[in-house]
């Protein structure tokens, strides 16, 4: 099962291609510890994007990593996040080859970060970037809705 959630408009074909690329990247990296080159002329996949990849197995989180700044073309950001979520999330051991068929993949393409007042936050639409000193963490929009949080719980 796979899903691409975007803040920008991507066609169904582009979303499918990103999910395919994400899974292929995980498979190849698991076997060969490398990221395959990817060639595309699709302008939507070449534009810089901030991306998070979430991996689950049987609904249990198995990895979630990405970046909030659009430093790479979308396709490469997906590849980087796929490898990081699958093999570098410090909360979990790396994905094993026998786990790959069970992976549920979500790709979140983030919109540019903007300040927002707390009373303007819409659960399921807005994520939160929380910073304290040099540390920061991101709550994707689905975190609050998946956990049935109200606004106060989300902000606590």
Describe each PLM feature range.
Residues 1-156:
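Basic nucleic-acid-binding interfaces
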